[in-house]
């Protein structure tokens, strides 16, 4: 009797997890469809967006704030470069919002020259809004002293730069306004490759549930035969 109850509870849990993954599959499909629609649409003024949801193509007007650059290490998904940094600079819009903008990638050997990239002229930036990154336990902490960041945590950036940053950042499209050849443009193509694996997860849970029943049936037959 106890075995029957354990099997029933386990089977119910496995089936529930399978249906939960099917629900997540539907949600992810809607999310990806909405994201792709936003990314392929013309850029809209940031002020027209009613919330700070990520993956909107926007345009902002304002100026970069000097002496506030962040050097974000790595991320080959945004650039083909191997050993270098993403130049991330706070941008103050004409609406008086301050937003971090990922402007381009530069190699490690050009770290000194890149300080010439920021000026206080007004510009229009077109790019894609991105959510704040979460600190991962397997990554070292950001090296604030040497300005080497591994995670673009916007709360930490706000504290470090002493700025009231928006809760999203922007990946700028195209060549940076500095026209420095050493600052390579970024790409958002990696966003189109976001996977939706929830069907595989659902099939895994359902498969485990079926396996459980098969094992239970074999077990019961052996018990009866004995």
From Swiss-Prot:
The lineage of its organism: Bacteria, Pseudomonadati, Pseudomonadota, Alphaproteobacteria, Rickettsiales. The chain crosses the membrane at residues 3-23, 199-219. Coiled coil: none annotated. GO terms for cellular component: plasma membrane. It is a multi-pass membrane protein. It is found in: Cell membrane. It comes from the Bacteria. It comes from Rickettsia felis (strain ATCC VR-1525 / URRWXCal2). The keyword Membrane applies. Belongs to the SURF1 family. InterPro entries: Surf1/Shy1, Surf1/Surf4. Keywords: Cell membrane, Membrane, Transmembrane, Transmembrane helix. This is SURF1-like protein.
């Amino acid at each position: 009797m106890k075995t029957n109850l354990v099997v029933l509870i386990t089977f119910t849990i496995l089936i529930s997890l399978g249906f939960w993954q099917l629900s997540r599959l539907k949600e992810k499909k809607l999310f990806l469809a909405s994201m792709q629609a936003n990314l392929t649409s013309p850029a809209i003024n940031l002020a027209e967006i009613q919330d700070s949801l990520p993956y909107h193509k926007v345009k902002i007007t304002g100026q970069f704030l000097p002496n506030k650059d962040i050097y974000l290490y790595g991320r080959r998904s945004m650039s083909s470069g191997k050993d270098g940094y993403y130049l991330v600079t706070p941008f103050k819009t004409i609406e008086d919002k301050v937003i971090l903008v990922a402007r381009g990638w530069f190699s490690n050997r050009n770290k000194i020259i890149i300080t010439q990239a920021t000026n206080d002229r007004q510009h229009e930036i077109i790019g894609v809004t991105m959510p704040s990154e979460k600190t991962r336990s397997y990554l070292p902490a950001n090296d604030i002293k040497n300005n080497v960041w591994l995670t673009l945590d916007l709360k930490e950036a706000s504290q470090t730069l002493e700025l009231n940053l928006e809760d999203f950042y922007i990946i700028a499209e195209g060549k940076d306004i500095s026209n420095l050849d050493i600052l390579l443009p970024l790409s958002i193509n990696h966003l189109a490759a976001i996977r939706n694996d929830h069907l595989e997860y659902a099939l895994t849970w359902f498969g485990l549930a079926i396996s459980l029943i098969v094992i239970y049936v074999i077990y019961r037959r052996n018990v009866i035969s004995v």
